């Protein structure tokens, strides 16, 4: 089974944590809501652009699964970010990964760490035998600190100019 099928086989409660949930992007309304997300210019270089992530999902949908990140605000779900879980293509070894961001209004609240923990849980539940590798821009020290705190180790491998962190 591919990543999409494995994720689809998981129970709905696997996609929720204490404060957030991942909602699969399936409709035009979801695409519109995703299109409203933006980061300030100084943060844009640290993450894949949304068009690139959606392009990956279009080219290989079975291995690239996009989600909105939602949090309840005033009893209604608010879109606070985006995450795409994917199986890395074109690498020597099979690996799982993600691209994600939280919009500025919700940064600094621990929601990025919560999203990363939820992503780890989902990927481990879907494909426990496949390691998780994350590519990180050299100057994205916030992501590097977060991934180290979550148990990732810096690898000697590089993804172009990016550092690669591996969860053993």
Regions found by a protein language model. Name each.
Residues 113, 138-156:
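Conserved active-site alpha-helix within GNAT-family acetyltransferase domains
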Residues 125-135:
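Conserved GNAT acetyl-CoA-binding A-motif
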Residues 133-144, 160-163, 168:
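Conserved beta-strand-loop-alpha-helix junction that forms the acyl-donor binding cleft
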Residues 110:
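Glycine-rich phosphate-binding loop
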Residues 2-107, 116-118, 122-126, 156-160:
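Acetyl-CoA-dependent GNAT
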Residues 96, 128-130, 151:
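Short loop/turn motifs at secondary-structure junctions
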């Amino acid at each position: 089974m591919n990543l999409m099928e494995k994720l689809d086989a998981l129970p709905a409660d696997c996609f929720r944590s204490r404060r957030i949930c991942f909602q699969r992007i399936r409709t035009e309304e979801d695409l519109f809501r995703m299109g409203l997300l933006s980061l300030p210019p100084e943060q844009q270089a640290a993450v894949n652009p949304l068009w690139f992530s959606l392009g990956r999902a279009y080219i290989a949908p079975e291995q690239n699964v996009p989600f909105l990140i939602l949090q309840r605000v005033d009893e209604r779900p608010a879109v606070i970010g985006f995450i795409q879980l994917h199986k890395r293509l074109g690498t020597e070894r099979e690996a799982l990964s993600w691209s994600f961001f939280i919009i500025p209004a919700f940064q600094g609240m621990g929601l990025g760490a919560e999203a990363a923990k939820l992503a780890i849980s989902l990927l481990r539940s879907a494909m426990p035998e496949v390691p998780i590798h994350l590519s990180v821009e050299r100057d994205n020290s916030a992501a590097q600190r977060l991934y180290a705190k979550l148990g990732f180790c810096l690898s000697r491998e590089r993804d172009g100019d990016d550092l690669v962190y591996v969860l053993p």
